[in-house]
Regions:
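Carbohydrate-active catalytic/glycan-binding domains of CAZyme proteins
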Residues: 19-281
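Bacterial Sec-dependent N-terminal signal peptides
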Residues: 1-20
Length: 281
């Protein structure tokens, strides 16, 4: 899959050096503008007015319980400024104390101008999953948790998830093991299930290049790394065809799992930039 640019691997706690850098170096800590390690696991990037915003899980060394989602910004994808803990642990509910919050994804809704955040919320034993919904009027502001994302009036009780925003402005929720849902015009609920990709694994991430849709996914090895693979389709509804691995066999996706593909604008072209997270070493 020659279109995929491997440029950014996000560690459990990843970040840039305090001095200005001009090169992304994978596999080592990065540091933000305050000299602190960039802490943004399971992340995504949103471009806004020529600036890049990185959203991820703010991890603690003491517990896997959700402490918040972080936001950093950069004008070069190398030097990062800490912006905010954009969503903190809630007093109660799906992201309350002793809950898990993972795989945060943010999109700007073209109809409303609102920023929509989706995430996997769960209990500490991963037996009470939800797809959660939070919103904000500004990209790096304080997001308000609205509750579970609903489909036909019911919560989506799934775990590994991703999002995709098509060039026509439509937003999609991607779910492990194959479901692809189109969001409503305001991105606050699910409108329809538009595809179900047979043979998919976990950690779904989608992009489009030259009119072809690509879906990346990982094998099922719990916390351990594996060789991720991909599917393609002429339209998001399918038919979807399994194509094989997108990294050399045995490299275990360079010790990462797909989390997001950022459409990086380079002159007149847009290059898919792979983002992977690490769960084990």
């Amino acid at each position: 899959m020659k279109y995929l640019l491997f440029l950014l691997f996000l560690l459990l706690k990843a970040g840039t050096a305090t001095a200005q850098n001009n090169l992304v170096v994978n596999g080592i800590p990065w540091f933000d503008d305050k000299g602190n390690i960039v802490n943004a696991h399971g992340a995504c990037i949103v471009e806004e007015n020529g600036r890049y915003y990185l959203f991820g899980e703010w991890k603690s060394d003491k517990s896997n319980a959700f402490p918040g989602f972080s936001c950093y910004s950069s004008d070069d994808l190398v030097n990062w400024k800490f912006e905010n803990i954009v969503l903190r642990v809630q007093p109660e509910g799906i992201l309350g104390p002793n809950r898990v919050g993972e795989r945060v994804k943010v999109m700007k809704c073209p109809k409303t101008g609102e920023y929509i955040m989706l995430m996997h919320a769960d209990d500490m034993e991963y037996k009470d999953p939800y797809i959660g919904l939070a919103t904000c009027k500004t990209i790096a502001g304080d997001y308000q948790l609205q509750g579970p994302l609903l489909y036909k009036g019911q919560p989506v009780k799934r775990w590994d998830m991703g999002t995709f925003q098509d060039t026509d402005g439509k937003g999609y929720l991607l779910i492990h093991h194959g479901p692809v849902y189109r969001l409503s015009d305001d991105y606050r609920s699910i409108e329809a299930e538009v595809a179900h990709i047979k043979g998919m694994g976990e950690s779904p991430a989608m992009f489009k290049k030259n009119g072809v849709y690509f879906m990346l996914t990982s094998n099922l090895t719990s916390w351990e790394k594996n060789d991720n693979f991909y599917f393609t389709a002429p339209q998001i509804e399918g038919p979807w065809t399994k194509q094989g691995l997108f990294c050399p066999e045995g490299k275990l996706t360079y010790n990462s799992q797909s989390t997001f593909v950022f459409p990086l604008k380079c002159g007149n072209d847009t290059i898919p930039m792979f983002m992977g997270d690490r769960w084990s070493y």
